[in-house]
Swiss-Prot record:
Pathway: Amino-acid biosynthesis; L-arginine biosynthesis; L-arginine from L-ornithine and carbamoyl phosphate: step 3/3
GO molecular function: argininosuccinate lyase activity
Full protein name: Argininosuccinate lyase
Disulfide cross-links: none
Native source organism of the sequence: Maridesulfovibrio salexigens (strain ATCC 14822 / DSM 2638 / NCIMB 8403 / VKM B-1763) (Desulfovibrio salexigens)
Length: 460
């Protein structure tokens, strides 16, 4: 048997060292050791229940695998690159511990269904961690909204001042985005929660296996329907990574806003010292490095996703060695997404706001212009005409470096005789927000309802 490989019976020549270095995966797939051992223990128990192994043999295997787990977690386990992957490393060490019965563990199983099971279990564990982290993040944004219902700031389109909104409404927009991300994570969990054990290499096996038993021992909800599909697709990984990419997209958007808001020209937020860095030459600097890095890491997560999609796009059924390239992109995506969600929640909890600067910004950019147009519509003027009248008033005020609310009634009447004293109630920024009564708007009733709904959801 060449190289003493577990698969070496068919080979006479030794594997070239360069090939071993090029093809090994143990340097990174050892991250799946918990899942691999759990999957092997479930497989052994199932084999015993089906009469393929004796109960005594299964018990020996399970206890031997427990010892392997202890050795790995204590740092005593020696990973050997020449063994190719974690499966061979673990099985080889198991056989050293328990003797010839170790060779029976792989009965009715291929590394193809073995690694598919390992990876599904790993992705599921990661998604559960994302789900928990997102819940804390949603709670952080909801808490900020709850504490800032009365604070107003400009709402923007094209990054130009548009209409006044409450800071609570702004925070809630992100809470809803992350809640949708949470629901996508749950959907990913539901679809990934399928046990491939029993599919073997690609066509199933002649042994009387019972995949449902293996799934039960692993706590997985369902079993595969088609053995080719079970071992050859990584859609559950790509779907998780796409969801991670969307999470990072939403994080990157709030990061962009926080970077802008931290600029003294805006001054809307007080960057927590714990989440800022300084300059080696400019003593006054307080840089939003965490936000900038998170914005930058978003592209990295996109790259992880596209890397795996490109790997899988041309693969014929069933398993191909290309699929070894599925793990490192996901490991990187998982680490980046989870860390980003956690640190954003912590940063938002520590974030301070500058309501006075937000209020000052309301007076720049004619954010009450739409209110004047709506006021004129209420006086019976068609909206397009009201839009033109308001635009003319804005042009005059802008030329004189004034706000609409600074113009006298007589001046406003030169644009329309429909304008009366009550117009000044409409031009108030606070009134503009209070007058928003449509569902989902920035109006107080809508904001209160949103906060209540999110709080109720978080308690479930």
């Amino acid at each position: 048997m060449a190289d003493n490989k577990l698969w070496g019976g068919r080979f006479a020549a030794k594997t070239a060292q360069s090939v071993e270095d090029y093809t090994e995966s143990v340097s990174y797939d050892q991250n799946l050791y918990r899942e691999d051992i759990s999957g092997s223990q479930a497989h052994a128990k199932m084999l015993a229940e089906q009469g393929v192994l004796t109960a005594e043999e299964a018990e020996i295997l399970v206890k031997g695998l427990d010892q392997v787990l202890e050795e790995i977690e204590s740092g005593k386990f020696e990973w050997k690159k020449e063994m190719e992957d974690l499966h061979m490393n673990i099985e080889s060490r198991l056989t050293e511990i328990v003797g010839p019965v170790g060779g029976k563990l792989h009965t009715g199983r291929s590394r193809n269904d073995q690694v598919a099971t390992d990876f599904r279990l790993h992705v599921l564990r990661s998604l559960e961690a994302w789900k928990t982290a997102l819940e804390k993040l949603i709670a952080s944004f909801t808490a900020k909204a709850d504490a800032n219902r009365e604070v107003l700031l400009p709402g923007y389109t094209h990054l130009q001042p548009a209409q006044p909104v409450s800071l609570a409404h702004h925070m809630l927009a992100y809470a809803w985005m992350f809640k949708r991300d949470h629901s996508r994570v749950v959907d990913c969990i539901n679809r990934a929660n399928v046990c491939p054990l029993g599919a073997a290499a690609l066509a199933g096996t002649t042994y009387p296996l019972k995949p449902a038993t293996s799934a039960k021992y692993l706590g997985m909800e369902d079993t595969f329907r088609n053995s080719l599909d079970a071992v050859s697709d990584r859609d559950f990984v790509m779907e998780a990574m796409f969801t991670g990419s969307l999470i990072m997209t939403h994080l990157s958007r709030i990061c962009e806003e926080l970077i802008i808001w931290a600029n003294p020209c805006f001054g809307f937020i007080k960057l927590p010292d714990e989440f800022s860095t300084g300059s080696s030459i400019m003593p006054q600097k307080k840089n939003p490095d965490v936000c900038e890095l998170m914005r930058g890491k978003t592209g990295r997560v996109y790259g992880d996703l596209f890397s795996l999609m490109t790997t899988c796009k041309g693969l014929p059924l069933a398993y191909n060695r290309d699929m070894q390239e599925d793990k490192e992109p996901f490991f990187d995506c998982d680490k980046t997404v989870h860390a980003s969600v956690v640190i954003m929640a912590d940063m938002m909890d520590a974030m301070g706001f500058n309501p006075a600067n937000m209020e000052s910004a309301l007076k720049k950019g004619f954010l009450n212009a739409t209110e004047l147009a709506d006021y004129l519509v209420g006086k019976g003027i068609p909206f397009r005409e009201a839009h033109h009248i308001t635009g003319s008033a804005v042009a005059k005020a802008e030329a004189e470096s004034r706000g609409l609310e600074d113009m006298s009634l007589e001046e406003l009447k030169t644009f329309s005789d429909k304008i009366e004293e009550d117009v000044f109630e409409v031009l108030s920024y606070e009134a503009a927000v209070r007058r928003r009564v449509s569902p989902g708007s920035t109006g107080p009733e809508s904001v209160d309802s949103q906060i209540a709904e999110l709080k109720a959801w978080l308690k479930k």
